[in-house]
A protein has these predicted regions:
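Helix-loop junctions and terminal segments of transmembrane helices
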Residues: 62-81, 138-139, 249, 253-294, ...
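Alpha-helical transmembrane segments of multi-pass membrane transport and lipid-handling proteins
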Residues: 86-119, 159, 163, 261, ...
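Hydrophobic alpha-helical transmembrane segments
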Residues: 115-121, 147-195, 211-212, 219, ...
Length: 468
């Protein structure tokens, strides 16, 4: 008889979940982004702006529906999936009805918004279908089970939205596609999870679950507002087409970090809470991986904003160029704070994470209103650089890691500075807004990536090569 196969080590399960997470994000987001690129040529900016306003409202509503429970599930040893399913289903239906009734309240942002919102509100309950199976697979570090459903959802949304936009449906092409995608994803995810997820309904647990997830709920709510409130501030001062320009520029700036975000980081940090060395190392490697790709994208967009907008959105979207120039480096600072938040959640430091996000929200609203009233949407973009909560997060990360923070700070400095000479040379050698600079910048990004890969290949191999 052969020797029994060794169970995969924690590091190997993390690697598999990480690769699966990247596969999901890459396929779904590239397909979705390609669809938006196509629709940019089929739907006017006003339609994009109207959709973004409605999307932000239902997304924040979905955070209210969840009450932070899906995130608490990852760290609750009782695995109360059935109780959370009952809660999200009931609240999803209730909030959907509330949005339908209260839709006229949002008419001040755009006269057509209430009608769109009444239909789009159904997304809140449909999206809630997938909450429990998604949390289950993430907790068990088996995210690969979600590859099929997530990729299928992306293709359905892309095909349906482009097809309906081509038929002249305008903003409704976005809405119909999102509703169909949410329904498909929920049904398929449950087909993978059914029989594996314990669904015992224990309603007496609900008050305790809500209490323990309260900080996570408020964190998630504030995070949603920090992420999406730009659109509403711009909507107050500008026309809906400007909202569309800003939203698409934001989407380009954040495309890379959304794809390469380490989705398995939170459950991995929970796994290593008692192993300080590996806890630090996994946080450090996740930071290097995410910000390493992002800084290359930021430099590329900074030196090639005009051509990037032309290729991705078309010539009618030229007003998005100055917005993209301002937004290009926002993800580099934003994503470090998000990674720090994952670490604080794993350490149950929910209050500290909430304080940081509230400070960021206050800064964003305050500076955003002042800057937007003076300089329009570009001022709102600039306000994202004035978030003092990011400094608080840097201090908290330093306080947790102390002497090891020097290593992390050196990594951040290297990531930020190493690509600069490559891109600066391309910018110096070729004129702005030229195809030669665009091509040279691609070469610069490839060379900088190769140097960074050589620098960090050894620590990545050392971490993920560990066996049980």
């Amino acid at each position: 008889m052969g020797e029994p196969a060794l169970a995969p080590s924690t590091e190997q399960r993390i690697l598999r979940s990480t690769v699966a997470g990247y596969s999901i994000q890459l396929a779904r987001l590239l397909v979705g982004f390609a669809a938006k690129v196509a629709i940019a040529r089929l739907v006017l900016p006003e339609g994009h702006g109207l959709y973004e306003l409605a999307l932000r409202i239902v997304t924040v509503a979905s955070a209210v529906r969840d009450l932070g429970l899906p995130y608490h599930l990852v760290r609750d040893t009782r695995r109360p999936y059935g109780t959370v399913l009952a809660s999200t289903t009931f609240l999803g239906a209730a909030i959907t009805l509330l949005l339908v009734v209260a839709a006229p309240v949002f008419g001040g942002l755009d006269p057509d918004l209430p009608f769109v919102l009444r239909v789009f509100a159904v997304w809140v309950v449909l999206d809630g279908l997938s909450v429990v199976p998604k949390a289950f697979f993430e907790r068990e570090l088996t995210i690969g089970r979600l590859v099929g459903p997530e990729v299928a959802r992306g293709f359905v949304i892309a095909a349906l939205s482009v097809g309906l936009a081509w038929l002249g449906w305008g903003v409704w092409s976005f809405v119909a596609a999102d509703l169909a995608g949410a329904l498909l994803y929920g049904v398929w995810a449950w087909s993978r999870a059914w029989g594996k997820v314990p669904l015992r309904l224990e309603l007496p647990l609900l008050p305790d679950l809500v209490r323990k997830s309260a900080w996570l709920f408020w964190i998630w709510m504030v995070l949603q507002l920090v992420t999406y409130i730009d659109i509403f501030i711009i909507g107050i001062f500008e026309e809906t087409d400007v909202v569309g320009f800003y939203a698409r520029a934001w989407g380009i700036a954040f495309l890379v970090p959304t794809i390469v975000y380490p989705r398995a980081l939170f459950p991995t940090l929970v796994e290593y809470l008692e192993d300080r060395d590996r806890f630090f190392e996994v946080f450090r490697l996740a930071t290097v991986q995410l910000l390493g790709f992002q800084v290359l994208a930021s430099y590329f967009l900074l030196f090639n904003a005009e051509k990037s907008v032309l290729i991705l959105l078309g010539k009618d979207w030229a007003p998005a160029v100055p917005l993209l120039l301002v937004l290009s480096f926002i993800p580099f600072f934003d994503q470090f704070t998000i990674l720090g938040g994952e670490m604080l959640k794993a350490r149950h430091e929910d209050r500290a994470w909430l304080i940081i996000m509230v400070v960021n929200l206050i800064c964003l609203v305050g500076f955003g209103v002042i800057f937007t009233s003076r300089w329009g949407a570009a001022g709102m973009a600039a306000a994202n650089y004035c978030l003092l909560g990011n400094l608080l997060m840097a201090w908290r990360v330093w306080d947790i890691f102390r002497p090891r923070f020097r290593t992390l700070a050196a990594d951040l400095a290297l990531l930020y500075l190493l690509p600069l000479p490559f891109f600066a040379l391309a910018a110096w050698a070729f004129p702005a807004d030229s195809w030669t600079r665009f091509a040279a910048s691609i070469v610069a990004a490839a060379l900088a990536l190769a140097v960074l890969a050589l620098r960090y290949l050894k620590p990545f191999r050392a971490f993920f090569g560990r066996r049980a």
